[in-house]
Amino acid sequence: MEGGGGRDEPSACRAGDVNMDDPKKEDILLLADEKFDFDLSLSSSSANEDDEVFFGPFGHKERCIAASLELNNPVPEQPPLPTSESPFAWSPLAGEKFVEVYKEAHLLALHIESSSRNQAAQAAKPEDPRSQGVERFIQESKLKINLFEKEKEMKKSPTSLKRETYYLSDSPLLGPPVGEPRLLASSPALPSSGAQARLTRAPGPPHSAHALPRESCTAHAASQAATQRKPGTKLLLPRAASVRGRSIPGAAEKPKKEIPASPSRTKIPAEKESHRDVLPDKPAPGAVNVPAAGSHLGQGKRAIPVPNKLGLKKTLLKAPGSTSNLARKSSSGPVWSGASSACTSPAVGKAKSSEFASIPANSSRPLSNISKSGRMGPAMLRPALPAGPVGASSWQAKRVDVSELAAEQLTAPPSASPTQPQTPEGGGQWLNSSCAWSESSQLNKTRSIRRRDSCLNSKTKVMPTPTNQFKIPKFSIGDSPDSSTPKLSRAQRPQSCTSVGRVTVHSTPVRRSSGPAPQSLLSAWRVSALPTPASRRCSGLPPMTPKTMPRAVGSPLCVPARRRSSEPRKNSAMRTEPTRESNRKTDSRLVDVSPDRGSPPSRVPQALNFSPEESDSTFSKSTATEVAREEAKPGGDAAPSEALLVDIKLEPLAVTPDAASQPLIDLPLIDFCDTPEAHVAVGSESRPLIDLMTNTPDMNKNVAKPSPVVGQLIDLSSPLIQLSPEADKENVDSPLLKF
């Protein structure tokens, strides 16, 4: 059998082994061993066993055999294998076959040895690096894991946690406590100056409540003047206010003594005069204490705290930047220090009052400073009047309007009037009265009364005032009594642009405050403190620049515009029709003023009618006649003066009488701009501002030539007006129009 022949090979090899050398014997043995080993895996019957075994791919068994051959272990294994195989029948090999088998055996043995050695070396090498690499990898991973664990331990460590917590807790906790003491320190400082008068109000629960808002106002002023106290004071204002209201009486005993006087002032003007004399002396030391840190800051706080209600409303309506600018400008260190010193010493106050009077004529900013003190005490207006007759007279006219409203509301103007002359006579008393105003709501009522007196006194002066623009504020006088305090607050923003408007608005809220003394007084106080300086500056400026004057005129008109509501708007539209040029030039200004008030159009036409820029001579004449009538009218009821003013303005608009009658009710702010179309027909209101501009030359014969320039101005202001073409209220509410 083949198998037998195959098995004869080892026998032949053995026979040859006897003749062969030892190495050959080893080779033969190796072959035999391998053959037998492979017989285990392969069938013994296959004749090509050797070929199959050795030429096939090397498996795990072959590698193991190669390793054993290298170790010379196959020698002992060989005898058992042949012994085990001995029972099989072996056929003898022929000589040729034996030689062939021998050669093949050697070749196979060499091949197997070489391959086995290479494989063994390769297997040994990769095993070592693999094991080493695995170990290294494990070590590295352990190190990395240890690092992570260490980091976790560091994070979890109580020290690290404590550090983090302390840092977080320290930054916020330390900040607020520091701010609180600052607020506390600031709160005593404030009550020492302006809160003393507030304490005088504190005896009554409503007065204490008002004192708190006033303190908030003072905090606003302090924040504007000094950024250090801004956040703390704003956040802690309610607490500080409550604490101040409680602790201030203990802190300032003098104001407590004044407390009984404060209600009496609010009730009786004569008592107010006596209290004014008393208050200036006490607030003066408070003011002196505050100026030590910053005279203008302390007194600025005084001025701010008085009008809480109106001041808050003003802050809402007016841009914070504008209010801050007003407060900063109005509360100039030197001027307020002078006021405080004047409070301390009436003689010095007199000298300084004369200085203030001279200042308004010279520059607008001193007027603004005076305006603060003047609002504090209308007497300032009177001393300022001789120094600057034009600005002072216009400003007085504004206050005259306010005073007329106050006279209508309050019956005590005569009693207040003597106090006013007394204050101007003694500059110190006047400054003291201003300080008292900043300190107490009583001063607010007195302010309204003084404004009435100043109105009575300044009415005569206003009548001679040549500038129609300043006379226009009388319109606002008529309107202000009817208009509600919120309307005044609305008008106050545009009045910021126009000093006269602001003055009238501030005065009107004071009169209204006479009804609800505490709230209105607080609001009036803030109003007088912040906006007045800007308005007085404007009053000083208008004579120098007529353009600013129409703005000032427009703002007072804005107050009556509210009262007139739709009717004044229509009237104003009729008036503005003939004067498109001036109207559009001032449209941007009017738009600025209008957003604050529901009926800005009436203000706009008035300001335009009185503005020197008007191209129509008829308008200037009509405005002069209207101003004269208005001067005569303000003595009477303010409302009739408004109606007359509207009628007078309609007369200059006689160029288009048909439209005048129709749009009185229908014309909104856009209609106001559309007044030329209104002349054509009431249905033309729907036309856009641009269409109106194009139509204006046709409608307004007098304005036809400058109409292109007016068109440009309207184009700039048209988008703001177009926001709410149908209703003026919408324009007022629109954010773009608001300042």
UniProtKB/Swiss-Prot annotation:
Residues 181-195, 284-294, 330-342, 411-424 have a biased composition (Low complexity). The modification Phosphoserine is found at residues 91, 157, 171, 187, 208, 247, 262, 331, 480, 496, 499, 514, 520, 523, 528, 535, 555, 594, 611, 707, 717-718, 724, 734. One of its GO terms (biological process) is microtubule-based process. It comes from the Eukaryota. GO terms for molecular function: microtubule binding. It is found in: Cytoplasm, Cytoskeleton. Residues 1-20, 116-136, 149-306, 320-639 are annotated as: Disordered. Residues 360-372, 430-446, 455-470, 481-522 have a biased composition (Polar residues). One of its GO terms (cellular component) is cytosol. May be involved in p53-induced cell cycle arrest in G2/M phase by interfering with microtubule rearrangements that are required to enter mitosis. Overexpression delays G2/M phase progression. This is G2 and S phase-expressed protein 1. It comes from Homo sapiens.
